[in-house]
Amino acid sequence: MKTTNKTTVMKDRKAMLSLLWIFVMFNFTYADILTLYFNNVLQKEAWKLFQSGYVGSVHITQGFVLLGAILLETSIAMVLLSRILKYRANRWANIIVGVIQIVANVQSLTGPLFLNLFYVFFTAIEIACLLFIVWYAWTWRQPEGAVLTSAQSSS
């Protein structure tokens, strides 16, 4: 009969979530690199578009760029947070950030200006992985025998 240490199961779940966030980040990165490298519109027109302050109908402001940076940073932070947060905070952080990232990814597909087949492919992989992260965190149950103190349950 196989016995499993509850602490090991918890650490394995944390490690898997962290690894999934790394996978998502690599997909984000390479989708953007390939878009910048292979998209003719970006190669020829990006500077003019950004200088005008608009890309398509989107007004590029410091606030817009900051929002993009925050979205990227939340994914980067989840690599670390998935490893160090306690059960309850970890579970909810993965669910909330995963859902936010799914919405952002779906939104990125609505603008036709820079879409390429490879971008759609990467985004589909990202969304599938993010859906798995949300499901994996959602189905994560408190380890049996673990009793949360009031201080732990608030974290």
Can you say where each PLM-predicted feature lies in the sequence?
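Helical transmembrane-bundle signal
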Residues: W21-D32, S75, V79, G98-S108, ...
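Hydrophobic transmembrane helix segments
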Residues: V24-V65
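Cytosolic juxtamembrane helix and N-cap/initiation of the first transmembrane helix
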Residues: M1-F28
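Membrane-helix boundary connector in multi-pass membrane proteins
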Residues: N90, V103-T123
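Juxtamembrane helix-break-helix junctions at the cytosolic face
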Residues: L72-W92
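Membrane-water interface at the C-terminal end of transmembrane alpha helices
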Residues: A128-L148
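Hydrophobic alpha-helical transmembrane segments of polytopic
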Residues: L20-V24, L67-L71, A93-Q101, F122-I125
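Extramembrane terminal tails and long inter-domain/linker segments of multi-pass membrane proteins
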Residues: M1-V9, R141-S155
